[in-house]
Design a protein with these regions (language model features):
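An N-terminal RHG(E/S)-centered segment typical of histidine phosphatases
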Residues: 71
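Asp-based, Mg2+/Mn2+-dependent phosphohydrolase catalytic module
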Residues: 2-5, 9-41, 46-68, 81-106, ...
Length: 360
């Protein structure tokens, strides 16, 4: 461990010095603008509905309670979703007793906002979450013509005859055989794997994306997926299936239905590059008046295949904690630059690295 920390320290200390303009802003606003921190949420700051004990102290350190005596910009980068950025910020703020703004939150589907100009008025199927919650988020992002699997079941219950929608179900009724889909977007975990697998595969292989039309031997509309995590951690003693499990099922069903054809899709969420570019834009916007880009970004996560793989590929410094799905010495396939017990230790290491560099 000592050699690993020394390597990280050496690499950080060799980075270029802070530009003078950034130093002036730093001293004027008491911000340490040369670095930024990105936290995963589940398994790092919280575990299900329980907070991780060191989380609040870690955020306090970044708020200026550190040997730098300066604030360090930070953001939350999660593969979770199904709520708005504001709702997630409010939820985590309540849990930790620490104010976090919506501008600091990147959800798995946040970068999908960039698709809104392309599909502004087009009919899209949004999958995931309860009722029309994800459809509401899509509307907020700028998608104006959105339907959900439950809307389709309300139109033709026999399309998935294993459920009965109650009177409380929020649905928008329309004649789906007259309104073809231009795209399918999976925003969040499926709340009914069977229903969603059936409906998504129906749309993907129907001529022109029109439900009820003949099946064709190819994919007819684009598919966008938001969270590749196969598992996630909550209050249960062992990890649970995540949205990535739905993706695996969808690919398997598609292969079986099309005699081995490959499913084509665009992925969002960690560990994919689009998510990290979006997070960097969020971090830059937090200190936009200073007009400074962060030279070092530290990513703290618990999932080697998502948090660590993505951070390493983005050129960030990755720190793996043992409070979520990982509990070993380091991951063999996606090794982190540093491995620590919890988020408090992670932020302490970051402050130590930045303090040593800052005082040179």
């Amino acid at each position: 461990m000592a050699s690993t920390i020394a390597t990280a320290l050496t690499r950080a200390l060799r980075r270029p010095q802070t530009p003078l303009s950034c130093k002036r802003q730093l001293h004027a606003q008491k911000w340490h603008l040369d670095a930024a921190v990105v936290f995963d949420i589940d398994g790092v700051l919280v575990r299900g509905k329980q907070t991780i004990r060191e989380a609040r102290r870690a955020l306090d350190m970044l708020s200026g309670q550190n040997k730098l005596n300066r604030r360090v910009p930070f953001a939350l980068l999660t593969n979770g979703g199904g709520v708005s950025e504001q709702a997630k910020a409010s939820q985590i703020s309540r849990m930790l007793g620490f104010e976090i703004s919506a501008d600091q939150v990147v959800l798995a589907h946040s970068p999908m906002q960039a698709l809104a100009p392309k599909y502004h008025d087009s009919h899209v199927l949004v999958v995931g979450g309860p009722d029309r919650q994800c459809a509401d988020i899509a509307h907020m992002y700028g998608f104006r013509n959105v339907s959900t699997p439950n809307d389709i079941v309300a139109w033709r219950p026999e399309i998935w005859p294993f459920i009965t929608l109650g009177p409380e179900a929020r649905v928008e009724r329309r004649q789906f055989d007259k309104h073809p889909f231009a795209a399918v977007m999976v925003f969040h975990d499926s709340f009914d794997f069977g229903r969603d697998l059936q409906i998504v595969t129906d749309v993907l292989r129907s001529r022109d994306g029109r439900l009820g039309a003949e099946y064709v031997g190819r994919q007819t509309v684009p598919l966008y997926l938001s969270n590749a995590d196969l598992i996630f951690s909550n209050e249960y003693v062992r990890p649970r299936f995540g949205q990535g499990a739905f993706h695996e099922c969808l690919r398997a069903m598609w292969s079986a239905l099309t005699r081995g054809a490959s499913l084509e899709y665009t992925r969002y969420g960690k560990p994919f590059a689009v998510q990290y570019r979006h997070a960097e834009q969020v971090l830059d916007a937090l200190v936009a008046p200073a007009n400074c880009r962060h030279r070092r970004i530290y990513a703290i996560g618990d999932n080697p295949a998502a948090d660590i793989a993505g951070a390493n590929a983005a050129g960030w410094t990755s720190i793996l904690v043992r409070t979520g799905v990982f509990s070993g010495a380091n991951d063999s396939e996606n090794p982190a630059h540093l491995v620590v017990d919890h988020v408090g230790d992670a932020v302490e290491k970051i402050i130590d690295i930045e303090h040593q560099r800052f005082t040179l």
